[in-house]
């Protein structure tokens, strides 16, 4: 674990002391090396061996998310270069230092061995993200978005803190492995349903579940490119990871509490997918698409079958890469047209033909076409929910159809149609942008060859 954490910490002095012209090169190259090194945590056995100490450990559930965090840091650095072109050197340094600080908090959160440690790091990720949104966002509404983001997350996670203190008092420990192995005495009291709700609420707000989702479109739309990427790809996964971890100590799950949330998640998928159909703002459409996909993860996690757990873990990785790629593509359009409205940036296929190929691939990946891991994760989740209730097949089938419609609607709106007058004078694409897209798409396709790397502990 330290072989990833220490080099990431050393990025901070590297960024601080690099010369102006070398800062981007040093940080990009060094973070790519760290992401290559993190691949060693994949494909390990359940006997923890060298990946375990008293504070941090990695297992088949946390290591894919750990690798995803490391993989996205160089991509965020590459994607932010144009956005920060007119900023002073100190502001650029501050921006990169915030990204690396967020990365360190995420790495420690995904490998924390105790729930209280996880909770503290879960809250720590809030600070750099809030500063990135509030300082480097595009419009003045960014302050409003920052407030929504802060208060939704804080109010959702306060009951979790109380629940963790109560669990510590009852069981004497919050160690993840210890709680997994001990019989659960928490079920003897009538207050177990309240405890379950308190534990889940923080993660359901972070996912977010439909109904608690109002902060997400605002935060996504106002955040700069790196903020949108890390929010969609990794911060939402903190919620899914927390559910998969904490559900172990809440077993056996009470039908009285689980059923309403499974129903709300499946219904929320239909609702948010339908909202996508009438969006005019490109980033807002991708944000609502994220809520729809995270609804699948919530439903699969709460059903608590091995296939459900595997599908949820695979969906988190697949969605992380896909939504991050879509936000990068939306950003390339925004940098050229200075607008997120799809009507104003149509007809780009004629001007940027290679970029339209990336748009096509990203849209097809988003709707779950083979040979991507999105298909594998969706099939696993559909099978596990169908085994729980036959009726869910109608809802999930409808959701799949609507997802295909809005993905293709997004593609046609941006790429096809009559070109606007300002489309003729836009800049050509850069090699840097093509590299970012390729590095997003490569793992999505390659993981199909060996999906057990990302199927988590249930495999």
Swiss-Prot record:
Signal peptide: none
Cell compartment(s), UniProt: Mitochondrion membrane
The protein's enzyme class: translocase
Membrane protein topology class: Multi-pass membrane protein
Organism superkingdom: Eukaryota
GO MF terms, alphabetically ordered: NADH dehydrogenase (ubiquinone) activity; ubiquinone binding
EC number: 7.1.1.2
Matching InterPro entries: NADH4_N, NADH_Q_OxRdtase_chainM/4, NADH_UbQ_OxRdtase, ND/Mrp_TM
GO biological process terms on file: ATP synthesis coupled electron transport; electron transport coupled proton transport
Catalytic activity field: a ubiquinone + NADH + 5 H(+)(in) = a ubiquinol + NAD(+) + 4 H(+)(out)
Principal place of residence: mitochondrion
Residue ranges of the TM segments: 22-42, 65-85, 96-116, 117-137, 146-166, 194-214, 230-250, 256-276, 284-303, 308-330, 350-370, 392-412, 435-455
Family: Belongs to the complex I subunit 4 family.
Role: Core subunit of the mitochondrial membrane respiratory chain NADH dehydrogenase (Complex I) that is believed to belong to the minimal assembly required for catalysis. Complex I functions in the transfer of electrons from NADH to the respiratory chain. The immediate electron acceptor for the enzyme is believed to be ubiquinone.
Protein name: NADH-ubiquinone oxidoreductase chain 4
Native organism: Zaglossus bruijni (Western long-beaked echidna)
Gene that encodes it: MT-ND4
């Amino acid at each position: 674990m330290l072989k990833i954490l220490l080099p990431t910490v050393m990025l901070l002095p590297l960024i601080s002391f690099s010369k102006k012209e070398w800062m981007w090169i040093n940080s990009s190259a060094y973070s790519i090396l760290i992401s290559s090194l993190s691949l060693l945590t994949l494909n390990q056995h359940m006997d923890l061996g060298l990946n375990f100490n008293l504070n941090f450990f990695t297992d088949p559930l946390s290591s894919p998310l750990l690798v995803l965090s490391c993989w996205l840091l160089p991509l965020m650095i590459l994607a932010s270069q144009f956005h920060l072109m007119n900023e002073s050197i100190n502001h650029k340094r501050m921006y990169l230092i915030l990204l690396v600080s967020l990365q360190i908090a995420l790495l420690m959160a995904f490998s924390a061995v105790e729930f209280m440690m996880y909770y503290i790091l879960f809250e720590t990720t809030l600070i750099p993200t809030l500063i990135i949104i509030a300082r480097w966002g595009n419009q003045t509404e960014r302050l409003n978005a920052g407030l929504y983001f802060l208060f939704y997350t804080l109010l959702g996670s306060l009951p979790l803190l109380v629940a963790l203190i109560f669990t510590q008092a009852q069981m004497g420990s919050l160690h993840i492995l210890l709680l997994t192995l001990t019989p659960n005495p928490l079920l003897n009291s009538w207050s177990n349903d309240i405890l379950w709700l308190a534990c889940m609420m923080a993660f359901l707000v972070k996912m977010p579940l439909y109904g608690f989702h109002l902060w997400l479109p605002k935060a996504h739309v106002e955040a700069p490119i790196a903020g949108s990427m890390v929010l969609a790809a990794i911060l939402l996964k903190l919620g899914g990871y927390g559910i998969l971890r904490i559900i172990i100590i809440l077993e056996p799950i009470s039908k009285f509490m689980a059923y309403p949330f499974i129903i709300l998640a499946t219904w929320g998928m239909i609702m948010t997918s339908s909202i996508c159909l009438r969006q005019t703002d490109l980033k807002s459409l991708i944000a609502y698409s994220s809520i729809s996909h995270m609804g699948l993860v919530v439903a699969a996690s709460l059903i608590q079958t091995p296939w459900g757990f595997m599908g949820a873990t695979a969906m988190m990785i697949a969605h992380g890469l896909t939504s991050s790629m879509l936000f990068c593509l939306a950003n390339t359009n925004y940098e050229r047209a200075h607008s997120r409205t799809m009507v104003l940036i149509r007809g780009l296929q004629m001007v940027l033909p290679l970029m339209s190929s990336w748009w096509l691939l990203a849209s097809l990946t988003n709707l779950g076409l083979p040979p991507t891991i999105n298909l594998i994760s969706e099939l696993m989740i559909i099978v596990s929910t169908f085994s729980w209730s036959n009726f869910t097949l109608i809802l999930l089938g409808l959701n799949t159809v609507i997802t295909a419609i809005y993905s293709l609607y997004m593609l046609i709106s941006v790429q096809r149609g009559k070109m606007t007058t300002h489309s003729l004078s836009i800049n050509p694409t850069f090699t840097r942008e093509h590299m970012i897209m390729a590095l997003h798409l490569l793992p999505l396709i390659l993981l199909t060859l060996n999906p057990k790397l990302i199927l988590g502990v249930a495999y």
